[in-house]
Design a protein with these regions (language model features):
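Helical "lid/coupling" subdomains associated with nucleotide-phosphate turnover
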Residues: 3, 22-60, 66, 72-147, ...
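Beta-propeller domains
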Residues: 8-19
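Active-site glycine-centered loops adjacent to acidic/histidine catalytic or metal-binding residues
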Residues: 151
Length: 443
């Protein structure tokens, strides 16, 4: 949950929205409550209670409240639309019990998720419009940033492009602050970090051997129902299996075999356009600078801070991934004892990220040098949520803002003239005092 704030008298302004606070909902996403819809609403109560404290009481009824659901709910809606509707109805009942101005809960499309993340990044980093010292807004000379988001069930890539997309489904045209933007965007469902980990787990089970991406010395009981319960992994499962059965699986710390297992997630052979990323999806060449956030950031941050490895180039990222995937379970625990629950999967996540960027999206060394891994801009998280809120509340106008922030130019001129007059008067007074001190009659 994110709470944003902005001055009430600057509603059509920009550069003024900031994140007031946030709250992490415990447990899984709302899609995990498909068989217990009421639990989805109950899971939000703790954060909603925090919102009651964080938002001033006299602003409760005037504060808009939105819920946007992403890839997890898109998957549920594909396979069990009735269950998805029940979950949304349950969270709606909970949200309407609070004094905020609830304005709806909906499932975002993959295109929406990608574009809203792109809007958030460029809004926060002032790529659309900047505020000058003389009280005027101006268009920055530099271009926009591309955005890459790696969520739990999907991953998105979005960037501005000069040429029309060969596949109209991958193009969005926006008009912001009087400027036109042609944006390429695509969301890959089942390529979010959580679903990738499940697909790799299913792939490891098919080999009847150890999991090459897990560290040697680590083992876990794997519930088959948990592995094959997703539409992303259903095709990898046996035709019949005991849903209550479990299998003991161990890791082997084999970087080369892990890379091979990850490569099976991508299809590079089919493309009906002039060029594709993977799975037959059109993508123009990546251009300009990019910001990579969410699980992209957390993976790189682990490699940098916990493993102490450089990742400034694609080659360094590959070497760092190989080093990580060669670690044993005891070695990893010694490095990060507080992250025991996440440690087994960092190798798989890093290997997938490297292949997605280099082979999937086509980043070479030159293009990769323009990628920044960042999860916040100031105190505000980078992600789709802020862009979604800005769109729903019309805080980004299509035309340039008519309002000026702070003191306008004419006021600056008057202040400068007054300052000059005071300074001149002070100089005249000092000169007179100096002359008086030098006169014969002076004491």
């Amino acid at each position: 949950m994110f709470i944003y704030k902005w001055p009430a008298d600057k509603k059509n302004d920009t550069g003024i929205v900031s994140q007031h606070s946030s709250c992490n909902v415990h447990g899984g996403g709302i899609s995990s409550y498909a068989d217990n819809p009421s639990g989805a609403g109950q899971s939000l109560v703790e954060c909603l209670d925090q919102a009651l404290r964080d938002v001033p009481k006299d602003r409760h009824t005037g504060t808009p409240l939105y819920l946007g659901a992403t890839a997890g709910m898109r998957l549920l809606n594909l396979t069990r639309p009735e269950a998805a509707a029940n979950v949304l109805a349950a969270v709606t009942r909970t949200l309407t019990q609070y004094p905020f101005h609830f304005r709806g809960a909906r499932i975002l499309s993959g295109q929406d998720e990608g574009v809203f993340g792109w809007v958030t990044a460029n809004y926060l980093l002032e790529k659309f419009i900047k505020y000058g010292w003389v009280g005027q807004w101006f268009q920055p000379r530099k271009g926009t940033l591309g955005a890459m988001d790696l969520g739990g069930a999907s991953t998105q890539i979005t960037f501005e492009t000069a040429s029309p997309a060969e596949d109209p489904a991958n193009e969005v045209q926006l008009r912001l602050y009087g400027q036109h933007y042609r944006v390429y965007t695509h969301s890959f469902l089942c390529y979010g970090r959580d679903q990738v980990l499940q697909r790799l787990l299913a792939g490891a089970l098919q080999t009847h051997g150890p999991h090459p991406c897990w560290p040697r010395g680590y083992s876990a009981q794997v519930q088959l129902q948990d592995v094959y319960d997703s539409p992303c992994t259903a095709a990898q499962g046996p035709l019949t299996f005991n849903s209550s059965a479990s299998i003991s699986l161990s890791g082997s710390s084999e970087p080369a075999l892990c890379r091979s297992l990850v490569s099976q997630l991508f299809n590079f052979s089919s493309c009906h356009f002039s060029q594709c990323s993977f799975n037959g999806v059109f993508q123009p060449p990546v251009t300009g600078s990019f910001i990579a956030f969410s699980a992209f950031f957390y993976t790189v941050d682990f490699l940098r801070t916990v493993m102490g490895l450089p990742v400034a180039t694609l080659q360094q990222l590959e070497v760092a991934t190989t080093t990580l995937c060669s670690q044993t379970w005891s070695e990893l625990q010694a490095r990060a004892p507080g992250e025991r629950a996440h440690l087994p999967n960092y190798c798989a996540g890093a290997t997938f990220m490297h292949q997605l960027l280099s082979r999937g999206y086509g980043f070479d060394e030159r293009a990769f040098s323009g990628v920044t891994f960042q999860n916040k801009a100031g105190d505000t998280a980078v992600g789709w949520a802020l862009g979604y809120m800005l769109n729903l509340t019309n805080l980004i106008p299509a035309d340039p803002p008519g309002l000026r922030k702070g003191t306008d130019f004419s006021s600056w001129v008057v202040l400068l003239l007054l300052f000059a007059a005071v300074l001149l008067a002070a100089l005249v007074l000092l000169l007179r005092q100096a002359r008086s001190a030098k006169s014969p009659g002076a004491i």
